[in-house]
Swiss-Prot record:
Summary of subunit composition and partner proteins: Part of the 50S ribosomal subunit.
Keyword entries, A-Z: Ribonucleoprotein, Ribosomal protein
Top-level division of the source organism's lineage: Bacteria
Family as reported in the entry's similarity comment: Belongs to the universal ribosomal protein uL30 family.
One Pfam family from the record: Ribosomal_L30
Organism in which the protein naturally occurs: Leptothrix cholodnii (strain ATCC 51168 / LMG 8142 / SP-6) (Leptothrix discophora (strain SP-6))
GO CC annotations on file: cytosolic large ribosomal subunit
Gene Ontology molecular-function annotations: structural constituent of ribosome
Lineage, opening ranks: Bacteria, Pseudomonadati, Pseudomonadota, Betaproteobacteria, Burkholderiales
UniProt-recorded name of the protein: Large ribosomal subunit protein uL30
Gene Ontology BP, a term: translation
Length: 60
């Protein structure tokens, strides 16, 4: 069995004052408050979401 790769992201800036689509992307990644972390499956879709809001999140 192969183990699926994961990526851990943390919200480091507040999405207040950002575009609605960026706030929706933050929520889609499972992030709520500043410094909250989420462990996600490493897929192209998730990578694209991280790239879109790279100024708000940090990959750990």
């Amino acid at each position: 069995m192969s183990e699926k790769k994961t990526v851990r992201v943390a919200l480091v800036r507040s999405p207040i004052g950002t575009r609605e689509s960026h706030r929706a992307t933050v929520r889609g990644l499972g992030l709520r408050k500043v410094n909250s972390e989420s462990v996600l499956e490493d897929t192209p879709a998730v990578r694209g979401m991280i790239n879109k809001i790279s100024y708000l999140v940090k990959v750990l």
